[in-house]
Amino acid sequence: MGSKFSEYISRAASVEGFFLEQAAITWDCLLNYQSSHYIKGNFLEIGVWKGKSAILSCLHANPEETCLLVDLIMFDEAQELLKNLHSNSNFYRCKSQNFWQNEANLHQFFSSCRWIHIDGAHSGSACFNDLQIANQLLSEEGIICIDDFFNPSYPQVTAAVFNFLDQFPFSLKLFLCGFNKGYLARPYYCDNYLRYLLENFHNDLSMINYSGKITLYKTSRPGDFNCFGLREYQGKDFVGLDEDGSKILI
């Protein structure tokens, strides 16, 4: 499908919301990876508000893919904007737990979503509940993105994520974090995303004139914690092990 980043920046510029540019470019690269590897599936966003991040999901969605957009407080202009971008969008003005309980046909979306963004209520219990929903809907090759991960304003979100990962280690793993987001995938598919980040992520950034702006950190060995971290550019594309910064092990 190709990068949608430039179009996203243009369309989202006037939309109120909180979505860092570096997070948007990371989404764009990961969604391009999915498209180039023929990974298809639906999209779920819990917490839409005015639609700033959902714009990027709608731009990447293929016509046959459904965007499920859930928010108790969803603005009419957001609904109109997103529907115009992707006509195959379903809107649910409710709490996420009510969406889960009341949508009679939700079973058709089980294990079908390739991209899920959790940005709903920010209590620990709400985040844990949303992860339960996401775990049911995520496909084998999909990604769950958690908003405000490692944000010191919401430590309960980070705690809820690690609590969930501890309880369900065979369901999800953290493979990437940074710029206010955490990224989870199925354990047996994480290696593919880790390899992409190591081998092609920065190439993709350079193709859309975004090189020299993000550094990937991999300061641990796979047996310790197999996850990349994203930071603003530190003069190099990668930082590896503390004992040898040139060594990246996945």
Range-by-range predicted roles:
Residues M1-H117, A121-C145, F149-I250:
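A short alpha-helical cap/connector motif
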